[in-house]
Amino acid sequence: MHKELDDFFEDVITVRLTPERDGLDIIDQTLLPGIRKRICLRTKEEIWNAIRELKVRGAPAIGVAAAYGMAVTADHIQAEDFSAFYHALVEIKNYLASSRPTAVNLFWALNRMEQRALAEKEKSLDTVKAALFEEADRIREEDVAISRNIGELGFGLLKKLKKEGEPIGILTHCNAGTLATAKYGTATAPMYLALEHGWEGTDMHVYCDETRPLLQGARLTAYELCHAGITTTLQCDNMASVLMKSGKIHIVFTGCDRVAINGDSANKIGTNQVAILARHYGIPFYICAPSSTIDKSCPDGDHIPIEQRSPDEVTQMWYKERMAPEGVDVFNPAFDVTDHDLITGIITEKGVCHAPFAEDFARLKI
Ligand code: MRU
Protein backbone atom coordinates (compact mmCIF):
# COMPACT_ATOMS: atom_id res chain seq x y z
CA MET A 1 0.00 0.00 0.00
CA HIS A 2 1.26 3.50 -0.69
CA LYS A 3 2.96 5.31 2.14
CA GLU A 4 0.43 8.15 2.40
CA LEU A 5 -2.39 5.71 3.00
CA ASP A 6 -0.35 3.77 5.55
CA ASP A 7 0.39 7.06 7.34
CA PHE A 8 -3.31 7.88 7.29
CA PHE A 9 -4.18 4.47 8.75
CA GLU A 10 -1.60 5.09 11.47
CA ASP A 11 -3.08 8.53 12.27
CA VAL A 12 -6.63 7.28 12.59
CA ILE A 13 -5.92 4.05 14.47
CA THR A 14 -9.17 3.44 16.28
CA VAL A 15 -7.83 2.02 19.54
CA ARG A 16 -4.37 1.51 20.99
CA LEU A 17 -2.81 1.55 24.41
CA THR A 18 -1.14 4.68 25.75
CA PRO A 19 2.70 4.33 25.74
CA GLU A 20 2.53 3.83 29.55
CA ARG A 21 -0.07 1.06 28.96
CA ASP A 22 -2.33 2.70 31.54
CA GLY A 23 -5.19 3.80 29.29
CA LEU A 24 -6.81 3.59 25.86
CA ASP A 25 -5.77 6.08 23.21
CA ILE A 26 -8.66 6.40 20.73
CA ILE A 27 -9.53 8.72 17.90
CA ASP A 28 -12.76 10.51 18.82
CA GLN A 29 -14.95 9.56 15.87
CA THR A 30 -17.72 11.96 16.86
CA LEU A 31 -15.43 14.85 15.83
CA LEU A 32 -14.49 13.49 12.40
CA PRO A 33 -14.03 14.55 9.68
CA GLY A 34 -13.52 18.15 10.86
CA ILE A 35 -11.29 17.50 13.84
CA ARG A 36 -8.77 14.67 14.12
CA LYS A 37 -8.30 14.41 17.88
CA ARG A 38 -7.10 11.52 20.01
CA ILE A 39 -8.38 11.16 23.56
CA CYS A 40 -7.30 9.03 26.48
CA LEU A 41 -9.69 6.77 28.42
CA ARG A 42 -8.58 5.43 31.79
CA THR A 43 -11.60 4.51 33.86
CA LYS A 44 -14.26 1.95 33.07
CA GLU A 45 -16.83 4.75 33.03
CA GLU A 46 -14.83 6.68 30.40
CA ILE A 47 -14.55 3.53 28.28
CA TRP A 48 -18.27 2.72 28.66
CA ASN A 49 -19.23 6.28 27.65
CA ALA A 50 -16.90 6.32 24.65
CA ILE A 51 -18.52 3.14 23.33
CA ARG A 52 -22.04 4.31 24.13
CA GLU A 53 -21.50 7.73 22.51
CA LEU A 54 -19.82 6.20 19.42
CA LYS A 55 -16.46 7.86 20.03
CA VAL A 56 -15.24 4.38 19.25
CA ARG A 57 -17.65 2.39 17.12
CA GLY A 58 -18.01 -0.35 14.53
CA ALA A 59 -18.31 -3.95 15.73
CA PRO A 60 -14.64 -5.07 15.60
CA ALA A 61 -13.31 -1.77 17.03
CA ILE A 62 -15.81 -1.96 19.90
CA GLY A 63 -14.48 -5.47 20.63
CA VAL A 64 -10.87 -4.23 20.65
CA ALA A 65 -11.79 -1.27 22.90
CA ALA A 66 -13.61 -3.53 25.33
CA ALA A 67 -10.67 -5.97 25.45
CA TYR A 68 -8.15 -3.21 26.18
CA GLY A 69 -10.67 -1.66 28.58
CA MET A 70 -10.79 -4.87 30.55
CA ALA A 71 -6.98 -5.20 30.60
CA VAL A 72 -6.39 -1.61 31.70
CA THR A 73 -9.04 -1.53 34.41
CA ALA A 74 -8.23 -5.05 35.69
CA ASP A 75 -4.65 -3.87 36.21
CA HIS A 76 -5.92 -1.71 39.11
CA ILE A 77 -7.78 -4.51 40.88
CA GLN A 78 -6.36 -5.01 44.37
CA ALA A 79 -7.14 -8.56 45.41
CA GLU A 80 -5.86 -11.14 47.86
CA ASP A 81 -6.35 -14.12 45.58
CA PHE A 82 -7.62 -15.16 42.16
CA SER A 83 -11.18 -15.65 43.38
CA ALA A 84 -11.46 -12.02 44.58
CA PHE A 85 -9.70 -10.80 41.43
CA TYR A 86 -12.05 -12.81 39.22
CA HIS A 87 -15.12 -11.45 41.01
CA ALA A 88 -13.98 -7.86 40.33
CA LEU A 89 -13.06 -8.74 36.74
CA VAL A 90 -16.53 -10.13 36.02
CA GLU A 91 -18.04 -6.92 37.40
CA ILE A 92 -15.96 -4.89 34.93
CA LYS A 93 -16.91 -7.27 32.14
CA ASN A 94 -20.64 -7.01 32.86
CA TYR A 95 -20.44 -3.25 33.10
CA LEU A 96 -18.65 -2.84 29.75
CA ALA A 97 -21.05 -5.36 28.17
CA SER A 98 -23.95 -3.04 29.00
CA SER A 99 -22.61 -0.22 26.81
CA ARG A 100 -24.23 -1.35 23.52
CA PRO A 101 -26.43 -4.37 22.82
CA THR A 102 -26.21 -5.32 19.14
CA ALA A 103 -22.58 -5.87 18.05
CA VAL A 104 -21.76 -9.38 19.22
CA ASN A 105 -18.01 -8.66 18.95
CA LEU A 106 -18.31 -6.71 22.22
CA PHE A 107 -19.47 -9.81 24.13
CA TRP A 108 -17.17 -12.08 22.16
CA ALA A 109 -14.09 -10.01 23.10
CA LEU A 110 -15.13 -9.68 26.75
CA ASN A 111 -15.74 -13.44 27.01
CA ARG A 112 -12.38 -14.15 25.46
CA MET A 113 -10.71 -11.92 28.05
CA GLU A 114 -12.54 -13.69 30.87
CA GLN A 115 -11.51 -17.10 29.49
CA ARG A 116 -7.89 -15.97 29.31
CA ALA A 117 -7.96 -14.92 32.95
CA LEU A 118 -9.44 -18.30 33.91
CA ALA A 119 -6.78 -20.12 31.89
CA GLU A 120 -4.08 -18.38 33.96
CA LYS A 121 -5.76 -18.76 37.34
CA GLU A 122 -3.07 -20.93 38.91
CA LYS A 123 -0.45 -18.24 38.26
CA SER A 124 0.29 -15.02 40.19
CA LEU A 125 -2.12 -12.11 39.81
CA ASP A 126 0.64 -10.10 38.12
CA THR A 127 0.92 -12.85 35.52
CA VAL A 128 -2.86 -12.91 35.02
CA LYS A 129 -2.89 -9.13 34.56
CA ALA A 130 -0.05 -9.31 32.03
CA ALA A 131 -1.90 -12.09 30.18
CA LEU A 132 -4.95 -9.85 29.81
CA PHE A 133 -2.84 -7.20 28.05
CA GLU A 134 -1.38 -9.89 25.82
CA GLU A 135 -4.85 -11.19 24.94
CA ALA A 136 -6.11 -7.69 24.05
CA ASP A 137 -3.03 -7.13 21.84
CA ARG A 138 -3.76 -10.47 20.19
CA ILE A 139 -7.41 -9.58 19.51
CA ARG A 140 -6.26 -6.38 17.87
CA GLU A 141 -3.54 -8.04 15.76
CA GLU A 142 -5.89 -10.83 14.69
CA ASP A 143 -8.40 -8.24 13.51
CA VAL A 144 -5.84 -6.80 11.08
CA ALA A 145 -5.16 -10.25 9.61
CA ILE A 146 -8.87 -11.15 9.50
CA SER A 147 -9.89 -8.03 7.62
CA ARG A 148 -6.99 -8.53 5.21
CA ASN A 149 -8.34 -12.00 4.38
CA ILE A 150 -11.84 -10.60 3.93
CA GLY A 151 -10.29 -8.02 1.61
CA GLU A 152 -8.53 -10.66 -0.50
CA LEU A 153 -11.77 -12.62 -0.94
CA GLY A 154 -13.78 -9.49 -1.72
CA PHE A 155 -11.13 -8.32 -4.17
CA GLY A 156 -11.51 -11.67 -5.95
CA LEU A 157 -15.19 -10.84 -6.49
CA LEU A 158 -14.35 -7.34 -7.74
CA LYS A 159 -11.90 -8.76 -10.28
CA LYS A 160 -14.56 -11.10 -11.65
CA LEU A 161 -17.11 -8.30 -12.09
CA LYS A 162 -14.82 -5.53 -13.37
CA LYS A 163 -15.03 -4.66 -17.04
CA GLU A 164 -11.88 -3.53 -18.83
CA GLY A 165 -11.56 0.27 -19.01
CA GLU A 166 -14.52 0.95 -16.72
CA PRO A 167 -14.53 1.59 -12.97
CA ILE A 168 -16.47 -0.94 -10.97
CA GLY A 169 -19.37 0.64 -9.05
CA ILE A 170 -19.56 -0.37 -5.39
CA LEU A 171 -22.22 0.82 -2.95
CA THR A 172 -21.63 0.72 0.78
CA HIS A 173 -23.71 1.70 3.79
CA CYS A 174 -22.55 3.12 7.14
CA ASN A 175 -18.85 2.78 7.96
CA ALA A 176 -17.29 -0.66 7.98
CA GLY A 177 -13.90 0.85 7.24
CA THR A 178 -10.57 1.35 8.95
CA LEU A 179 -12.42 3.47 11.52
CA ALA A 180 -14.56 0.49 12.49
CA THR A 181 -11.71 -2.02 12.84
CA ALA A 182 -8.00 -2.27 13.57
CA LYS A 183 -6.86 -1.53 10.00
CA TYR A 184 -8.53 -2.46 6.70
CA GLY A 185 -12.19 -2.41 7.67
CA THR A 186 -14.47 -5.18 6.45
CA ALA A 187 -16.62 -3.70 3.67
CA THR A 188 -13.73 -1.43 2.66
CA ALA A 189 -11.09 -4.16 2.83
CA PRO A 190 -11.67 -5.31 -0.79
CA MET A 191 -11.08 -1.70 -1.91
CA TYR A 192 -7.89 -1.26 0.11
CA LEU A 193 -6.63 -4.66 -1.03
CA ALA A 194 -7.38 -3.65 -4.62
CA LEU A 195 -5.01 -0.70 -4.11
CA GLU A 196 -2.38 -3.02 -2.63
CA HIS A 197 -2.70 -5.23 -5.71
CA GLY A 198 -2.03 -2.32 -8.03
CA TRP A 199 -5.45 -0.98 -8.90
CA GLU A 200 -5.73 2.77 -9.17
CA GLY A 201 -8.30 4.66 -7.10
CA THR A 202 -10.08 5.38 -10.38
CA ASP A 203 -10.57 1.66 -11.10
CA MET A 204 -13.33 1.77 -8.49
CA HIS A 205 -16.18 4.17 -7.91
CA VAL A 206 -17.53 3.83 -4.40
CA TYR A 207 -20.96 5.23 -3.61
CA CYS A 208 -21.34 5.91 0.12
CA ASP A 209 -24.78 6.09 1.66
CA GLU A 210 -24.84 9.07 4.00
CA THR A 211 -26.40 6.83 6.69
CA ARG A 212 -28.95 8.75 8.70
CA PRO A 213 -29.15 9.62 11.50
CA LEU A 214 -25.51 9.55 12.64
CA LEU A 215 -23.95 10.01 9.19
CA GLN A 216 -21.23 7.36 9.47
CA GLY A 217 -21.19 7.12 5.66
CA ALA A 218 -20.74 10.84 5.11
CA ARG A 219 -18.46 11.62 8.04
CA LEU A 220 -16.35 8.47 8.13
CA THR A 221 -16.50 6.31 4.98
CA ALA A 222 -16.33 9.19 2.53
CA TYR A 223 -13.50 10.65 4.63
CA GLU A 224 -11.42 7.48 4.55
CA LEU A 225 -11.99 6.69 0.90
CA CYS A 226 -11.17 10.23 -0.23
CA HIS A 227 -7.90 9.93 1.73
CA ALA A 228 -7.21 6.67 -0.06
CA GLY A 229 -7.64 8.38 -3.42
CA ILE A 230 -10.57 6.15 -4.36
CA THR A 231 -13.22 7.78 -6.56
CA THR A 232 -16.00 8.41 -4.07
CA THR A 233 -19.53 9.77 -4.36
CA LEU A 234 -21.72 10.53 -1.38
CA GLN A 235 -25.49 10.22 -1.64
CA CYS A 236 -28.40 10.42 0.78
CA ASP A 237 -29.79 7.04 1.74
CA ASN A 238 -32.96 7.56 -0.29
CA MET A 239 -30.94 8.05 -3.49
CA ALA A 240 -29.55 4.51 -3.69
CA SER A 241 -32.37 3.19 -5.89
CA VAL A 242 -31.70 5.85 -8.53
CA LEU A 243 -28.05 4.79 -8.69
CA MET A 244 -28.95 1.12 -8.88
CA LYS A 245 -31.58 1.67 -11.56
CA SER A 246 -29.07 3.64 -13.66
CA GLY A 247 -26.69 0.66 -13.74
CA LYS A 248 -23.91 2.44 -11.85
CA ILE A 249 -23.75 -0.10 -9.02
CA HIS A 250 -22.25 -3.52 -9.75
CA ILE A 251 -21.90 -4.86 -6.21
CA VAL A 252 -22.83 -3.93 -2.63
CA PHE A 253 -20.50 -4.50 0.32
CA THR A 254 -21.64 -3.77 3.87
CA GLY A 255 -20.36 -4.71 7.30
CA CYS A 256 -22.47 -6.21 10.04
CA ASP A 257 -22.86 -6.32 13.79
CA ARG A 258 -24.28 -9.78 14.36
CA VAL A 259 -25.06 -12.69 12.06
CA ALA A 260 -27.56 -15.32 13.20
CA ILE A 261 -26.88 -18.96 12.39
CA ASN A 262 -29.42 -18.90 9.53
CA GLY A 263 -27.55 -15.95 7.94
CA ASP A 264 -29.91 -13.13 9.00
CA SER A 265 -27.57 -10.19 9.54
CA ALA A 266 -27.97 -7.09 11.72
CA ASN A 267 -26.21 -4.00 10.45
CA LYS A 268 -26.69 -0.25 10.54
CA ILE A 269 -30.27 0.87 10.06
CA GLY A 270 -31.04 1.13 6.35
CA THR A 271 -29.00 -1.91 5.30
CA ASN A 272 -32.10 -4.06 4.83
CA GLN A 273 -33.59 -1.59 2.38
CA VAL A 274 -30.31 -1.53 0.42
CA ALA A 275 -30.50 -5.35 0.20
CA ILE A 276 -34.12 -5.22 -0.97
CA LEU A 277 -33.18 -2.70 -3.68
CA ALA A 278 -30.17 -4.75 -4.72
CA ARG A 279 -32.37 -7.83 -5.12
CA HIS A 280 -34.86 -5.83 -7.20
CA TYR A 281 -32.15 -4.61 -9.56
CA GLY A 282 -30.24 -7.91 -9.67
CA ILE A 283 -27.13 -6.57 -7.94
CA PRO A 284 -25.03 -8.93 -5.75
CA PHE A 285 -25.26 -7.97 -2.08
CA TYR A 286 -22.43 -9.12 0.20
CA ILE A 287 -22.01 -8.85 3.96
CA CYS A 288 -18.36 -8.66 5.08
CA ALA A 289 -17.86 -10.05 8.57
CA PRO A 290 -15.17 -11.55 10.76
CA SER A 291 -16.27 -14.99 11.95
CA SER A 292 -16.46 -13.50 15.48
CA THR A 293 -19.55 -11.60 14.25
CA ILE A 294 -21.39 -14.88 13.68
CA ASP A 295 -23.38 -15.65 16.80
CA LYS A 296 -23.84 -19.40 16.95
CA SER A 297 -26.22 -19.06 19.88
CA CYS A 298 -28.60 -16.92 17.83
CA PRO A 299 -31.01 -18.93 15.64
CA ASP A 300 -32.36 -16.06 13.51
CA GLY A 301 -32.71 -12.30 13.18
CA ASP A 302 -35.71 -12.12 15.54
CA HIS A 303 -33.34 -13.02 18.37
CA ILE A 304 -30.88 -10.19 17.70
CA PRO A 305 -31.27 -7.35 20.25
CA ILE A 306 -31.65 -4.06 18.43
CA GLU A 307 -30.35 -0.89 20.05
CA GLN A 308 -32.81 2.01 20.25
CA ARG A 309 -31.19 5.42 20.46
CA SER A 310 -32.14 8.92 21.53
CA PRO A 311 -34.83 10.81 19.56
CA ASP A 312 -32.50 13.84 19.46
CA GLU A 313 -30.36 12.08 16.86
CA VAL A 314 -33.32 12.36 14.47
CA THR A 315 -34.91 15.65 15.49
CA GLN A 316 -32.03 18.03 16.09
CA MET A 317 -28.54 16.59 15.90
CA TRP A 318 -26.54 18.16 13.01
CA TYR A 319 -29.17 20.88 12.49
CA LYS A 320 -28.71 24.53 13.50
CA GLU A 321 -32.16 24.37 15.00
CA ARG A 322 -34.58 21.60 15.83
CA MET A 323 -36.22 20.23 12.67
CA ALA A 324 -39.20 18.41 14.16
CA PRO A 325 -42.06 19.55 16.40
CA GLU A 326 -41.45 19.35 20.14
CA GLY A 327 -42.96 16.23 21.64
CA VAL A 328 -43.28 14.26 18.37
CA ASP A 329 -42.86 10.52 18.80
CA VAL A 330 -39.59 9.32 17.19
CA PHE A 331 -38.61 5.85 15.95
CA ASN A 332 -34.81 5.48 16.06
CA PRO A 333 -33.51 1.91 15.94
CA ALA A 334 -29.74 1.90 15.33
CA PHE A 335 -29.78 -1.39 13.37
CA ASP A 336 -31.99 -3.51 11.18
CA VAL A 337 -31.83 -7.14 10.15
CA THR A 338 -31.32 -8.17 6.53
CA ASP A 339 -33.09 -11.44 5.84
CA HIS A 340 -30.70 -14.19 4.82
CA ASP A 341 -32.47 -14.77 1.51
CA LEU A 342 -31.51 -11.26 0.37
CA ILE A 343 -27.81 -11.91 0.96
CA THR A 344 -25.74 -13.20 -1.95
CA GLY A 345 -22.86 -14.15 0.32
CA ILE A 346 -21.20 -13.49 3.68
CA ILE A 347 -17.48 -12.89 3.28
CA THR A 348 -15.60 -14.09 6.35
CA GLU A 349 -11.86 -14.45 6.79
CA LYS A 350 -12.29 -18.20 6.37
CA GLY A 351 -14.17 -18.12 3.09
CA VAL A 352 -17.29 -16.81 1.36
CA CYS A 353 -20.46 -18.39 2.75
CA HIS A 354 -23.62 -18.94 0.73
CA ALA A 355 -27.09 -20.23 1.56
CA PRO A 356 -27.87 -22.42 3.37
CA PHE A 357 -25.58 -20.40 5.60
CA ALA A 358 -25.63 -22.72 8.63
CA GLU A 359 -24.10 -25.46 6.46
CA ASP A 360 -21.38 -23.21 5.10
CA PHE A 361 -20.56 -21.91 8.59
CA ALA A 362 -20.16 -25.52 9.75
CA ARG A 363 -18.10 -26.43 6.68
CA LEU A 364 -15.70 -23.56 7.43
CA LYS A 365 -15.63 -24.51 11.13
CA ILE A 366 -17.04 -21.16 12.20
O1 MRU B 1 -23.51 2.35 15.25
P1 MRU B 1 -22.20 1.99 14.61
O2 MRU B 1 -21.56 3.13 13.92
O3 MRU B 1 -21.28 1.28 15.57
O4 MRU B 1 -22.61 0.93 13.51
C1 MRU B 1 -21.59 0.34 12.74
C2 MRU B 1 -22.08 -0.59 11.71
O5 MRU B 1 -23.26 -0.82 11.56
C3 MRU B 1 -21.03 -1.32 10.92
O6 MRU B 1 -21.46 -1.58 9.63
C4 MRU B 1 -20.70 -2.65 11.62
O7 MRU B 1 -20.41 -2.44 12.97
C5 MRU B 1 -19.57 -3.35 10.97
S1 MRU B 1 -18.02 -2.54 11.19
C6 MRU B 1 -16.84 -3.48 10.40
Question: Where is each model-derived feature located?
Answer:
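Conserved phosphate- and dinucleotide-binding cores of soluble alpha/beta proteins
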Residues: 203-204, 210-366
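N-terminal active-site beta-alpha-beta segment that forms phosphate/nucleotide-binding
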Residues: 55-232
